Design a protein with these regions (language model features):
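Terminal low-complexity/charged segments
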Residues: 1-240
Length: 240
């Protein structure tokens, strides 16, 4: 009986034969094969992974955007010394690797999209990573023509990371407000946000205002003085 690792290696050989240089293997994680595909080959490779009898990845389980802006860098700068840091997930690069970057992230590339595929036919999973073409905006072809389930997943990656998916039938925000400024999962997005939103009863509508808090380091809780603490709001709550 083959072990799981033997079965994975056998299937890895099948993928190498079938796709050649279009798929580049990277270190596996959690017993799941992981490959990189260049942006120009993404659509054709995904279509073949779905249709090839030895692959039959009929289902896109999930896709997610990734921002590698700070990946592999040292601990965050703080105002005070810390003996243990924040247990930040970072990899130690091997000898000869560029300083400050982990081995699995490439210098000069910032945004990527990761696809998790499932073959119901063969009971297999595989993970793909495609680096976006360009940085601002990051671009990739939409895979909605291959897997319809990619529709809302790609909208989420666009909303949170700003990835533009060419050929998507309805690429618009899905989680944030329509007037939201920026993409909140980017590593350079301010933790305090860009604006504050509240309902103004006098105007009868939602209003946008400058952020009233300041970013601070090593402060787990910030007590804000905003509209909820205004005297009229407190009186209304007390007598409501």
């Amino acid at each position: 009986m083959r072990t799981m690792s033997q079965a994975l290696e056998q299937f890895a050989g099948i993928l190498t034969t079938r796709f050649g240089s279009r798929l580049a293997r990277v270190p596996s994680c959690c017993g799941e094969l992981t490959y990189e595909v260049e942006a120009e080959h993404l659509l054709e490779v995904c279509g073949e992974l779905r249709d090839d009898p030895e692959c039959r990845f009929e289902q896109l389980v999930d896709l997610a955007g990734v921002d590698y802006l700070e990946y592999g860098n040292a601990e965050w700068t703080t105002n005070e010394a810390t003996g243990s840091g924040f247990s930040r997930g970072r990899a130690t690069p091997p000898a000869g690797a560029p300083a400050g970057r982990a081995a699995t992230a490439e210098v000069g590339r910032r945004f990527a999209v990761v696809y998790h595929l499932l073959s119901v036919t063969h009971n297999r999973r595989v993970r793909l990573r495609a680096w976006c073409a360009g940085v601002e905006p990051p671009l990739l072809d939409s895979v909605t023509a291959v897997w319809q389930s990619a529709d809302w997943y790609e909208r989420e990656a666009f909303d949170l990371f700003g990835v533009l998916f060419r050929g998507h039938p309805d690429l618009r925000r899905i989680l944030t407000d329509y007037g939201f400024v920026g993409h909140p999962f980017r590593k350079d997005f301010p933790l305090i946000g860009n604006v504050e939103v509240r309902y103004d009863p006098a105007k009868g509508r939602v209003v946008y205002e400058p952020v009233a808090i300041e970013p601070r380091t090593l402060v787990p809780r910030v007590i804000r003085q905003d509209a909820r603490h205004a005297p009229q709001a407190k009186d209304a709550a007390d007598h409501g």
